[in-house]
């Protein structure tokens, strides 16, 4: 098995290299794959079936020979020819069953089989009796038909072989019979009839081959599309899982994924959700965890000196390093708030050493910042606080999901950081108990620095770093970066140093197709770019992605080709029944039978062409009687009407007048193409007419034509030579009898041209026809055919005896057409199955793509999501953008802190969070309104809602806009704040609460960017953001506080503002602030809620 796999891989590689391009510069990989597909799916099974049919026919001929009791010495040539042919075909059959030999000697096998069949035909013609004009026409017609339909010739070679076959038969017969004395008056008509039969066989065979090749090409294309969709689906699923898991922990990600898929699948899922008045809450309680809060001291001052790119790079590198430290210490990063970082140990699986993990992480963070400070000379430090307890963790709201934690213990951990000291890890007494003496500590006195700690009587400690007393050699000298500090800004020194850490970029794995082949959805290490030294490798990977995709597609195609082997369709299939070829899925079977068939009119056309050939043949050889004219005239009118109805749609498009009759014909044409029952009815009528007309006039032979004295076979010597001559002359007048048999064969072929019509229907029609024809040949008209053969031949062989030749020929054609019909039915169903699978997988891909987009847009604004979804090398770089005018809003519910309690009644705070989830979800609902399409939710911080406007504008276009238009988004933000107030009032009425919203708004320049590879997060930074936050924290309940600059803009937009006065803002000094008119707020918010 492994040798075969290696052989296939070498074959794939070699052929792929050969297929890299042709003379016209186009890839040729599809050509050789299609050849292989065509070879194994069509050519191989058909040539196997042909050999089985021929060998079976040889055995049947031998059986018939001995059953008839013919003398061996009279038919030596027959007994030599048939067993020899049987041996040759059996040897070829053995070789054909060896796949490798078949592929190498495909053309040779085709040529040998064709030559052997032609040789058999001439041997049958020359031996067994006198040569007649109708001799072996059925056998050569069989050769012509199978050359097109079953031998693996291309169309050109098939035409050449068939023309040689038919022309050689015509020429040989003409030469032989022209040299024979007597009986030449009908020779020309018989030869012409033979030519018409051969032309009909060529046309039917070429038609069959052309349509089958088109169908196979379509099946191949559908197979390729399905495999491509499967590869893409696998990629999308892996990408979606990675994306989801990069945003949310696995234990809630799958629940939320199921809800999104339900939402994307349409109204049915929505109807189920409407029965619940509450939004789903994805929050769980976890006990015995430790929470770490860390703040970079001095970063605000450093950030004010940074360019947008430097700021985002620094944050990404710093927090990327912290994520790495968190992973090493079994901690989960929760969120990034500006320059604040917090994480938890003990989620989602409880860990006994959670406190040690957090303390170790805090020490490592301080050590990492110390290295940065020592290496760059930039005055930054780390303040870390750790507390242990219980948390509620999960996601709230409908948009911009961010995994978060809530509880009194989380609040305490936050204050542990605020009450800490730079460079130290500040822990609570609870955490100290969990450490079990693992670290030395000293008094922390946190209650002196933070009133919350003092109010709650929290005893705090500082952890003594075990490495603190062991100084590294670096402290003995100033690094080169510091020595050069006078020559470059601190931010430049920081950026250059942090680049050496090589933190992964956000969403770096989104479009790496080399991740497609990883197992179990694991991200390979090659997917994570580590620093700029990998840029060249990334470029090479991107250039080779298409080639790898082609290789994977080719490999999957080879596997599919292996699955579509000659024997596979006869074995058990998951989708198709073995014998009947019906689909196991009843719905699929119904859909298949109801499939529209626009090509049906061409089937009828080809059948009518065969009918016309039968008519020409019988006109050439039959006596010209009134019955002949009337019968074919009536049949012609019926078929012409059917043909007209089928083509009515195309014919009437040119007609300007639309009479009721024309409209009925046009409608009928569409019904025939689109509905199965009219097609079935017309198929039965058309084939029945042709099959009946093949033998109809045989029943109207005159008595003189039907009765022939058996003189040639009599032993009475009293008959004179003149009587024998009369008998022969009468027999010659019945020269048309074999052409009834050939007309029957053409009638059977007419059934096979209805390629996509029900296989069982065609089989039933041909079976009834075969039984009827054999009844005529062997019973009702047996004496006529038998007497005719005995008059012409003294001891006729099997192929000279009309009854035997007719019955055997019809049976061989019946089996051949049955095999072709079944083969065609199988691949038609396979094509339908592939299309159905492709359609379903296409829908699943679209769902996955939409899911990925929803997930990405749940983290990023739409225009930023497009940046990462775009397939370009720029995705490898960090996204950052600076804006000159962005309006930032912080809306908080201070009362919620008092409302939040942890008790058994409210499930330890879970029910409080359920209400908060409803509030945030209702706030998020407003974002879907068209008037608020420009509002971008940034994040929620506890019960505070942060949003911004002006982020969707192209920065370069900000200055080109008119002043009023430039500030329109600030008015939109105020309107949004009004709407939030109205939503909260509505929630208060339903929940019997009295929450008040406190809003702070500011506008100005900001820097936007995406940071973090583990959990990518879109955020905005800058003084504008800090002041907006202060506008909220220093604000008044039920008021919207804005800065003086923002109030001036709002007044130009028609809003009224009331001066609050001068207030002291932490870090900004004294600022003059304003309240937006709350009466306007109240009226507008109520109208928003009503709308």
Curated annotation (Swiss-Prot):
GO terms for molecular function: adenylate cyclase activity; adenylate cyclase binding; ATP binding; magnesium ion binding; manganese ion binding. The modification Phosphoserine is found at residues 491, 544. Its EC number is 4.6.1.1. ATP binds at residues 295-300, 337-339, 383, 939, 1019-1021, 1026-1030, 1066. Mg(2+) 1 binds at residues 295, 339. Pfam families: AC_N, Adcy_cons_dom, Guanylate_cyc. Catalyzes the formation of the signaling molecule cAMP in response to G-protein signaling. Down-stream signaling cascades mediate changes in gene expression patterns and lead to increased IL6 production. Functions in signaling cascades downstream of the muscarinic acetylcholine receptors. This is Adenylate cyclase type 2.
